[in-house]
Every structure is written in C-alpha cells, then in structure tokens.
Amino acid sequence: MIFRELEKHEAPVLKDFLYEAIFIPEGVEPPERSIVERPELKLYYEDFGSSTGDLCIVADDNGKIIGAAWSRIMNDYGHVEDGMPSLAISLYKEYRGQGIGTTLMHKLLELLKENGFTRVSLAVQKENYAVRMYEKVGFKTVSENELEYIMVCIINS
C-alpha cells in the first residue's frame, strides 16, 4: 500500500469516493448513486485540480485506488470561513477499520501545511463512527446542529 498525491487524470475517482463517503445509518436504504450529481455534492469533485486548495492523497493498493482524502475551498456543508479548505475522506468498505483512513488524514494534513494552509474544516453526521478518527487526528467541534458536527483542525506549524 502506498500513499501518494492524486494525479490530475485520476480526478474522476473522487465522484465514486464521494458516494462512498455518504454515511448511511443502520437499517437505512442507501441512496441512488446519482445523488452525487446534485449541485451541492458536485462541488466536491467537479473540475478538481483546477483551484487553489484542491489537494488529494490516495491510498493505492497495487495500482488500485482504494481510498482518498481531499480538500477544496468551497461553500459546502462544512464551510467555516472563506479561504479555509473543507475536507472529505472515503475508503471502500472492505478497507475500513485498518488505519488507512487515519494515515490518509495525516498525509493530507501534511500536504495542506506544505501548501500554506493552517486550518481545514469538515462536516460529519453525529452517528458516523469516523467522528472518533477526526478527533484523534486533531479536529475539534466548532458548531453543531441536530444531525451534524462542523469540525476544524488547526494544522500545526
């Protein structure tokens, strides 16, 4: 398994990983894959690599991308302030729970720091088991609503 930056021609995989990132509570029917075509979700992958803050680390298992952590400056669910990138992360189900997501997060935080960013935000549903991983890598809750936390990580200098 290697961790590397996403190559521009590989950017279409982010659409698939965005679908994988959708938290589906126990007993709830998964949404159609077309949900990622909604304008508020296309923000996460459309024309990725064309803007400042479009950074991505992938987990590559013998040539197959099995996970991705990416950031983008956008007005999304996790938006906190202008100029602060929002983060998304996803792994295929069979690779979860093995520490790969934590490594992806650390690598992306390093890449953000190298690119001059000092903070990054995300939105996560309160029931999502990934909340613990986000806290473990340094994210703190800055606001919440009935269903979600908005979290920010200060990237150490």
Predicted regions and their residues:
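Hydrophobic adenine-recognition pocket in adenosine-nucleotide-binding enzymes
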Residues: 6, 89-91, 124
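Conserved acetyl-CoA-binding loop of GNAT-fold acetyltransferases
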Residues: 135-145
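A short beta-loop-alpha structural element at the N-terminal edge
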Residues: 1-16
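Conserved beta-strand-loop-alpha-helix junction that forms the acyl-donor binding cleft
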Residues: 96, 121-131, 147-156
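Conserved acetyl-CoA pyrophosphate-binding loop and the N-cap/start of the following alpha-helix
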Residues: 95, 99-107
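Acetyl-CoA-dependent GNAT
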Residues: 22-24, 33-83, 88-92
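Conserved GNAT acetyl-CoA-binding A-motif
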Residues: 105, 112-125
